[in-house]
Amino acid sequence: MEKRNERQVILFPLPLQGCINPMLQLAKILYSRGFSITIIHTRFNAPKSSDHPLFTFLQIRDGLSESQTQSRDLLLQLTLLNNNCQIPFRECLAKLIKPSSDSGTEDRKISCVIDDSGWVFTQSVAESFNLPRFVLCAYKFSFFLGHFLVPQIRREGFLPVPDSEADDLVPEFPPLRKKDLSRIMGTSAQSKPLDAYLLKILDATKPASGIIVMSCKELDHDSLAESNKVFSIPIFPIGPFHIHDVPASSSSLLEPDQSCIPWLDMRETRSVVYVSLGSIASLNESDFLEIACGLRNTNQSFLWVVRPGSVHGRDWIESLPSGFMESLDGKGKIVRWAPQLDVLAHRATGGFLTHNGWNSTLESICEGVPMICLPCKWDQFVNARFISEVWRVGIHLEGRIERREIERAVIRLMVESKGEEIRGRIKVLRDEVRRSVKQGGSSYRSLDELVDRISIIIEPLVPT
């Protein structure tokens, strides 16, 4: 790691692909502004330190068993991580603060701690050392504000939703519709632990020194303007992180299949549908086959990411009908993981069938690639509503996954005039968002304000 005798920032990501990527992107941005970077991380889903030689990486124990790391119950994983990591995190931070001639940190004052909002113990730990703590919001900010209202919405008895009200807007959570609530709020069995967790996040965020948002005013103007209804701390919308003028590097937990790019090179401009449902979502076998048949029936070229184990009860794609790949006549390619930024930036990519995670949504907007929305959980339903109904840069697939609906959406986007209209709108949005990170843009100015704020070094309390 390059020697820097300056201000040090401690970053602590949640060990999920959708959280690690933004945190490492933020690290590169802050490094470019003169800060030394130390990443504290768990053993579970540890980032590859060799991909980031300019940063210091410190691993702490997380106490997860092998079966717990494989669990599909994300709330359970987050609860266990918060229970298990508080003491190891405190011990690691204490070692960084306490001067040590052999640690190499004695001449680097710690400016602050930055961690994901899902860590609910870090505020109290930071306060015990007199360290400022900033919360990273890696969601669209309107969702971040709105999801704290989930317990209230539940208490008000929105569920079950009568059929006559299914398409009504949720007043507290626009542009979400009432029919989205049952999927975003979980089952009744999950309600108590989920509501308790959300309240802990809110309680741990309110006293923080600020919130760093992976969005920009161009995408989150209304919610940013209303943030003072919930928070009295500064908000710094400095996204999208990945298009800031900093060197690119890999932060994927999965190895991307680089053969995607030469395959795309052989395709015509804007002729390929890229399909990926992210790093967490999974499908039952029936839905997987409906997507497969729908894509085949379009007669359009497609590049499809199917993570190993993401189809319930299957290792990979062995449930495809016999002769499926041969029937595509070379128009389809299925990989275990893809270099998504490179794929979306490729001239051959004309559409993105996506789960609408916020990382993927931002990446698609920034490359001007229109979307077909197939949200699976949580914030993805909010993102899909903005894409299809507010910005109108995509098509929302609602209801059950059916091959005819997949086929119809792909044809509309890739062949019909509707797709050209959508493409024109996303190009305008792309240009607005990209301008935000340039000098004088809204995110650039917010980054200047953030750097000024965390440059004020408060002397930490040295543990005895």
Swiss-Prot record:
Enzyme Commission numbers on file: 2.4.1.-
Coiled-coil region(s): none
Transmembrane segments: none
Pfam families named in the record: UDPGT
GO molecular function, a single term: cytokinin 9-beta-glucosyltransferase activity
Entry keywords, A to Z: Glycosyltransferase, Transferase
Gene3D superfamilies reported for this sequence: Glycogen Phosphorylase B
Regulation: Inhibited by olomoucine and 3-isobutyl-1-methylxanthine.
Activity-pH dependence: Optimum pH is 7.0.
InterPro entries per record: UDP_glucos_trans (IPR002213)
Annotated UDP-alpha-D-glucose binding sites: 279, 338-340, 355-363, 377-380
Membrane as UniProt keyword: no
Role description: Involved in the N-glucosylation of cytokinins. Catalyzes the formation of both the 7-N and the 9-N-glucosides.
Family: Belongs to the UDP-glycosyltransferase family.
PANTHER family, alphabetized: GLUCOSYL/GLUCURONOSYL TRANSFERASES (PTHR11926), UDP-GLYCOSYLTRANSFERASE 76C1 (PTHR11926:SF1420)
Protein name, UniProt field: UDP-glycosyltransferase 76C1
Lineage summary: Eukaryota, Viridiplantae, Streptophyta, Embryophyta, Tracheophyta
